[in-house]
Amino acid sequence: MKKFLHPLAGLTALGVVGVLCTAPLSADPPKGAPAGLVDRPVAKPIADAPMTPVKITETRVATKTAVDPKPLSDTVKKGIDYLVKQQQEDGGWNQGGGWRTAIGPNAGSRIEGKNVEDPSDVGNTCFALLALFRAGSTPTEGPHKENVVKGLKFILTRVEKADKDSLYVTDVRNTQLQSKIGPYVDTFLVNLVLAEMKGKAGSEEKRLTAALEKTMNKMVKHQDANGGFANNGGWAPTLSVGIANKSFARAKQNGVHFDERVVARGLAQSNGAAAGKPAAGAAPAFTGPATAVKPSSGAFAAAPATGLGRGAGIAGGGAGAGDAGVRLYSLGQGAGNSQDFLNGLKVDGKKAEQVLKDAKSTKEEKAKAQKTVDEVRRAEKENDKVQQQLAATVRDDRFVSGFGSNGGEEFLSFLNISEALIVKGGKDWTDWDAKMASGLQKAQDKNGSWSGQHCITGKTFCTSAALLVMMADRTQFPVDVLKKTVQPKK
């Protein structure tokens, strides 16, 4: 049945839940489910040539915004104020309410309520920090610099206490983020935040550099040949892989040197996700049967993927491209990361062009430079196809229409799409940005927060993600990316 249906109305009409993916569905563990998230064994190293060691340098690529940023709206300011008030005494942020996956005798079941412990965790803290950072506060300046410093110290301490071999950076388990988009999401998020704050941490810069080197080494070590990570299961693990890829790209822009195969694998995974190709790697962790959740009256135009879902494998999570059958997730992740990686490759391409022009360059140096330029051209060509597909898709009203239930996964996907569309700019970007601003403003709660209606429901993540979507025009991109692309070979 291809006719577009409003999310929950469609499910009601069909009389089934979890059969046709016409809307984002939750996959919350039923009471007494057999297993929750557990520590996964360390994956065996890939049988390949040794990886180039991670090296942190002091260099930074010149960056600027793709467009002139709008002044912070009252909606954004209200959301920022909410986040600041929710910071815990230890400097971190917790989920901000909502369910958790139980540990112990009832492992795997869903627990929630005012008596359920909600400790600060790395993942939610990182996303809150990123929102404050995008709004103009760093550890050394801005109206909320003290909050940023406290939050940064919180995540640095957790990374410092973490072992060096596994892909974990936290001992807090079974959060919504881990259950829904992957058990290693905390590591990927902290790598992203550290990469973005590199060079701006003030007195904490030395600790930040050491922590970034540690998280980068963990991720490089555990990335598999397909651009994913072993045992990174969940409802929609493509989204956590997307965060990992974005963190690699931002690290590269900010002076972190690492093996070029990491980017090649990540780029291949991104283009595959954009094309809707099946995800490779281990089977996803159990997440329970899919269940629809009744939306609140203020739910934002949910189910942007409603009419375009894959409609397969939704009961176990991780189906198709690891997107739970919701095309929004994989297309947003793939298109966003394709652009992310190209941003860094274009910087390399500009440097390579200079080598080719330099009469003093050796034959070997020119051969290597030409290889880089050729790789950039190939990446540009592939990215052009991906971005054209994305632009055409977001123009389709079915992709952003209907009123149903949005979870944190949708908010994150909106962000991925925003950061892809803004690089090219134009009508596709302005139309999308206007839709996001209007819809998110209507969905904001009176206290300034946003909450999810399915899957990731915690207010910290959803509020941070919504704010980042509305502040996408403040994202910094390499200056060379915003200039003319690499010139064709004559």
Roles of regions detected by a PLM:
Residues 4-7, 24-490:
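Preference for long, amphipathic alpha-helical scaffolds in soluble/luminal domains
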Residues 9-22:
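Bacterial N-terminal signal peptides
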